[in-house]
Design a protein with these regions (language model features):
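Basic-flanked hydrophobic alpha-helices used for secretion and membrane insertion
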Residues: 1-271
Length: 271
């Protein structure tokens, strides 16, 4: 609410981003399908485009491939020395051998499948579960209802950028993020979780969701990170199911340099 009350003459646009858990499958060269460990690949979303130059074009150098042209194209962020943690590469299905240099061409075009909640989770005896058998994962991977995403660009943060705060790993558009969240909110497992005070997967009782939410803002340039202490609550469970209720970051685009100073002053007065 505090952000929304800001003088609109200072701001050209405000972008809300959410970090969510996605159901993603990968297929290895031998045809084996497995669930991708999204916590390992540092999944993140980048802000919506603002003006003619996109967020990625303005803040990240294109090393290989091309900037995304639609919501199903994702990017791979590397560090200032073009390096990437081997755990990320392994999770993405890239064969990593000791002291072996990975070519950009090995990464561009890699495809993964996002599985929507109603196909991923099955209900039995009042609880939900994931059938992770090889046969079912293969069936899910080949389903016509999947969202196919592909890596189209290798990017590195520009040295002079104040807003290049994406972690090394896979980053997807805010458009894809919102599409996924909207679908998750309509899914059976999320509706069931909203109506239950226990974890609909494990059956464990959830902690009180009415605890005061402590918001912490950190300013990086004009980017604000919003971390909410949710403990093990219903909100946290819903977020893990893709139905994010709160943004993980808010990016404010000032109209000009003077407006930026006024915005920072306004944010400094929070609390």
């Amino acid at each position: 609410d505090y952000i929304k009350q800001m003088d609109k003459d200072l701001v050209s646009e405000i972008s809300y981003e959410s970090q969510i858990n996605m159901n993603i499958l990968r297929e290895d060269e031998d045809g084996k399908v497995s669930i991708l460990d999204t916590s390992t690949i540092n999944l993140s979303s980048y802000p919506k485009d603002n003006g003619q130059e996109t967020y990625l074009e303005k803040n990240y150098e294109l090393l290989y491939g091309y900037y995304p042209t639609n919501k199903n194209e994702v990017v791979l962020i590397v560090d200032e020395k073009n390096r990437l943690d081997t755990n990320i590469l392994n999770a993405l299905g890239i064969d990593v051998k000791k002291n072996k240099e990975i070519k950009f061409d090995d990464l561009i075009g890699k495809e993964y499948k996002i599985i929507l909640n109603d196909e991923f989770y099955k209900k039995q005896n009042g609880h939900f579960y994931v059938d992770s058998s090889e046969k079912n994962l293969k069936k899910l991977y080949n389903s016509k209802n999947t969202i196919t995403i592909s890596i189209t660009a290798i990017l590195r943060a520009k040295e002079d950028s104040n807003l290049s705060n994406l972690p090394e790993g896979i980053s997807y558009s805010n458009e894809l993020c919102n599409y996924y969240i909207d679908d998750c909110r309509k899914s059976d497992i999320v509706k069931s979780q909203q109506d239950s005070n226990y974890n609909v997967i494990t059956g464990q009782t959830l902690k009180n969701s009415k605890n005061k939410e402590d918001e912490i803002f950190e300013i990086s340039g004009i980017n604000i990170l919003n971390n909410v202490n949710q403990s093990t609550t219903k909100n946290q469970m819903l977020s893990s199911l893709g139905a994010s209720l709160l943004p993980s970051s808010i990016t404010i685009y000032p109209k000009d340099f003077e407006s930026k100073s006024d915005i920072i002053e306004y944010l400094d007065n929070y609390n």
